[in-house]
Amino acid sequence: MRFQDASPDARAVVYAGIQAEPLVARAAALLADATPAQRVLARAVMNGMSVGPAVWQAMFPTLFGPGAPADGAERERSEAILAASVEVAERGEQVRSQVRGAIVESVTELLVRRRTGAAAPTSPVRRERRILFDGVRAEIHPYDVTVETPGAAEAIDCKWGARGINADVLHQLDDARTHAADEDEVLTATIVVFDAERSCLVRLERQTAPHEATRLIALETLDRLAAR
């Protein structure tokens, strides 16, 4: 088992531009330290139904209402997350979708890097990498995030919503885990979905592709990424 950079095709070039947007890095940094309620706020706003901050402040009284902190770091983060999420919501539908996907990948990378040793200069955490196995045709699509630690490798695919869970994704993750086992290697297959866990489980129940050995990280459990 070995890891390789993805080929710089047209898709990769376009997506690299999206990932390099300051808004992506700013939103990801905020969401990496966010509370569950703040992450739910971000998801709701970024769906683009309304770009009026007052609408969302009224819908999330625990963050902005009379009982919410009037000031301090938590209130400032809520305001910053709302502002960044509105910026995403104001984009056109296609660009908004791309930006949201890039944010989920960036949040995932930031949290994974908090694991012991993962933040070192020679970090094993990488983006957009393929996993190669002897005698097996390489997958077309690279993995969003990989942890390339010998004996504790991980392939992570990231999705904005539960509807992104499909047979192709599940097959690719499970195939990688299986091929690694064939080579006596350990590889954890993980899918990160920025959506409610219940929605993800309902979606998985409808899938016939193998997923029993694939780890699910949903909106409520994002912080588990930092603990392995």
Describe every region a protein language model picked out.
Residues 1-228:
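Intrinsically disordered, low-complexity Ser/Thr/Pro/Gly-rich regulatory segments
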